[in-house]
Amino acid sequence: MINWLVLNAVILIVAYLLGATPSGYWIGSWFYGVDIREQGSGSTGATNVLRTLGNVPALVVLVIDIFKGALAIALVRYIYSLVFAQNLTIIAGVTDIDTAKEWMVIIAGLIAIVGHTKSIWIGFKGGKSVASSLGILLAISWVVGLGTLSVFIVVLTISRIVSLSSIIAAISVSGLMFFTGQPLPYQIFAITGGIYVIWRHISNIERLLACKEPRIGQKLSTEQKMNK
């Protein structure tokens, strides 16, 4: 039992460190001499990088953040495919390895999301976990991941507001998980992860309600920065 718990703890620590990789901060700092945390919304995610540094660095950050989310899930599945991990699971008294793996997948996914928003490398600050959540969804179920991305793109095309698109996409995940018949752990991830991502957008929701949320190409006003 102890060995199995230690193994899972190590997996979750690595998942957190993957999620905590502050790609937006590092790219801004290393290549542009800019602390992205002190610019725009203060987020280290691709949207703030886009507003602050431009298209290319934003695209790089987006790809890295999607990849690190997917990698956290791939790590769990790889470890649980190894014979020694399966033996430890059985010795611990867990006979249904597939179900154990599914629960570990969602726990690792949630921890990676938290890592993105609360990165140990930059004073427990970070982004809003939209891109990393997409990577996790694509790794869990590519159908749900692409469905969520489609919702995001449609709303973004109509509204040109990234935060609104992210919020509606986060809401849609639960329905997509349910209607595609995903396992219960994945449906729980959709609900808890969606709530967390929406909570990270509280300041955006306040600006949306006040009709002050910037669209693509616009930057936050001084007043909005003070209230971010």
Curated annotation (Swiss-Prot):
Pfam families: G3P_acyltransf. It catalyses: an acyl phosphate + sn-glycerol 3-phosphate = a 1-acyl-sn-glycero-3-phosphate + phosphate. InterPro entries: G3P_acylTferase_PlsY (IPR003811). GO terms for cellular component: plasma membrane. Pathway: Lipid metabolism; phospholipid metabolism. GO terms for biological process: phospholipid biosynthetic process. The keyword Membrane applies. It comes from the Bacteria. One of its GO terms (molecular function) is acyl-phosphate glycerol-3-phosphate acyltransferase activity. Its EC number is 2.3.1.275. The keyword Cell membrane applies. It is found in: Cell inner membrane. It is a multi-pass membrane protein. It is an enzyme of class 2 (transferase). Keywords: Cell inner membrane, Cell membrane, Lipid biosynthesis, Lipid metabolism, Membrane, Phospholipid biosynthesis, Phospholipid metabolism, Transferase, Transmembrane, Transmembrane helix. Its main location: membrane. The chain crosses the membrane at residues 1-21, 56-76, 104-124, 136-156, 161-181, 183-203. Belongs to the PlsY family. Catalyzes the transfer of an acyl group from acyl-phosphate (acyl-PO(4)) to glycerol-3-phosphate (G3P) to form lysophosphatidic acid (LPA). This enzyme utilizes acyl-phosphate as fatty acyl donor, but not acyl-CoA or acyl-ACP. Probably interacts with PlsX. This is Glycerol-3-phosphate acyltransferase.
